[in-house]
Amino acid sequence: MVSEKVLAIIAVALGTYLARFLPLKIKFATSDKIKSFLSLSSTSVISALFVTSVFTPDAAEFGVRVAALFPLILSFYRWRNFGLSIFAAVLSYYLLRLAV
């Protein structure tokens, strides 16, 4: 049986993919209202994923997640590279989880 975590990861991955793919796929064959909705919905989906991943009822886990945001912010302001800043956040989260 597939665990709930695996299903959640698949659902988030599918939602993230569709939020990026659909605006590109139907970019030329839609009205202005649909284009506006799709451009705003992709931002909303990413924001919702961010909020649900940062806020947790566990205080120690919340502290680790907030602490992992600092390398993300600092590396983004330093290099202006989303990929590098996300890598810095993931690495810092991993190292913090090992320490806690």
Curated annotation (Swiss-Prot):
Protein name from the UniProt record: Uncharacterized protein AF_1754
Family: To M.jannaschii MJ1155.1.
